[in-house]
Design a protein with these regions (language model features):
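Sec/Tat-exported extracytoplasmic proteins
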Residues: 26, 76-79, 120
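Extracellular/periplasmic catalytic domains that process cell-envelope and extracellular macromolecules
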Residues: 68-70, 116-118, 244-245, 282-283
Length: 353
């Protein structure tokens, strides 16, 4: 089961990389057909002439949800952020804020997750599941259900903090910083921006605040072996800062920031840790993963999905010089991670037959 509430058009499908791996591993529907990326998911379905349909769990009763939890072997909530007005029919600047048309985790989602958890069906969730536009009460239910807590902070690496040279820099971040600090935006180098749900903004610039502006994902030796991932992996995309609230959860991987002395002070001012979870996992008595990053959002090319052994040529699949190339993360980290999770799910299903 794939849940994706952020499908703006056929070129912006957040679960693309999941379907790529399903195709590559030759996972099929019960009738033998491959999963259709444009149909086989729950969430937002864009149409023509600015029309759309929603196919989710909101009109389902308890029996319907119970049936779904029984039928599916694994659930992956790839993106619950949803669709904003400026991204959809208004065609305005996507780097500005706007009202939500559809999105956020819902009470029905929570009900389904509870049933999946009870049946020990593997659950994968990720970045912004607890963030806007998920209601506060639903966020609390999710946190209590899985023993974690979102701090309210999210952030990402920015290749250039110069507003003139980087048109993709979110201007609402710039305005919020100016209003909050009553000072001009003077940043020019690469760095990181952090935004809190209450409106606070923190900006860390290379040299002044950060020795290395790029967050690193660190995985210990045991989990490197379990998931076939490298010891360290750069991650220059959106992350959320989450706290583990249950000792039964395992921190599979951690984010490491590299602040200077001045950066340490700035992080402490906003209570932002320099080491925090990248992947949380629980295996007993239920199987759950939370990816504290926008992991599923990768621009994979489907023409390679049917080529057996293509992973052996992964060094040709991304630009080794461009540190912001999402394909690097897909081939080196995300793909082996998801392959390991899916294989474990498949083996567990076979053992129960």
């Amino acid at each position: 089961m794939i849940v994706d509430k952020t499908v703006i058009n056929s070129n912006s499908i957040k679960h693309r990389s999941v379907n790529w791996i399903l195709d590559y591993e030759k996972f099929t529907r019960k009738n033998g057909d491959f999963y259709d990326i444009s149909k086989d998911y729950f969430g937002f379905f864009p149409g023509e002439d600015e029309k759309y349909q929603v196919h989710d769990f909101e009109k389902m009763d308890d029996n319907d949800l119970d049936s779904l939890s029984s039928v599916y072997d694994l659930a992956y909530f790839t993106d619950t952020y949803g669709v904003m007005g400026n991204e959809w029919y208004r065609h305005r600047d996507i780097n500005e804020t706007s009202k939500s048309i559809y999105g956020g985790l819902s009470e029905k989602d929570i009900a389904l997750l509870g049933k999946l958890k009870k049946r020990n069906k593997p659950i994968i969730t990720e970045y912004n599941t607890m963030g806007f536009p998920t209601p506060l009460d639903v966020r609390k239910s999710f946190q209590e259900m899985f023993g974690l807590e979102w701090t309210g902070w999210m952030g990402r690496y920015i290749a250039s903090l110069d507003t003139i040279n980087n048109p993709d820099l979110p201007m609402w971040i710039v305005r919020a910083f100016r209003n909050q600090n009553n000072q001009n935006w003077t940043f020019k180098e690469e760095g990181m921006i952090f935004f809190h749900i209450d409106g606070r903004v923190a900006v860390l610039e290379k040299g002044r605040h950060l020795n290395n502006p790029m967050p690193q994902i660190y995985t210990d030796k045991k989990n490197q072996s379990v998931y076939n991932v490298p010891a360290t992996m750069i991650y220059p995309f959106w992350i959320d800062i989450v706290i583990n609230r249950n000792d039964s959860n395992e921190i599979v991987s951690k984010y490491l920031l590299s602040p200077t002395w001045e950066g340490e002070k700035l992080l402490a001012k906003y209570n932002i840790p320099k080491i925090f979870p990248a992947i949380l996992h629980r295996s007993i008595p239920y199987t759950f993963y939370y990816f504290c990053g926008d992991f599923a959002d990768n621009p994979t090319k489907f023409r390679f999905a049917k080529l057996e052994g293509i992973s052996g040529l992964k060094f040709l699949m991304y630009n080794a010089v461009d540190i912001t190339d999402r394909n690097r993360f897909f081939w080196e980290f995300y793909m082996p991670m998801i392959q390991s999770i899916m294989d474990d799910c498949y083996q567990n299903r076979l053992s129960k037959k």
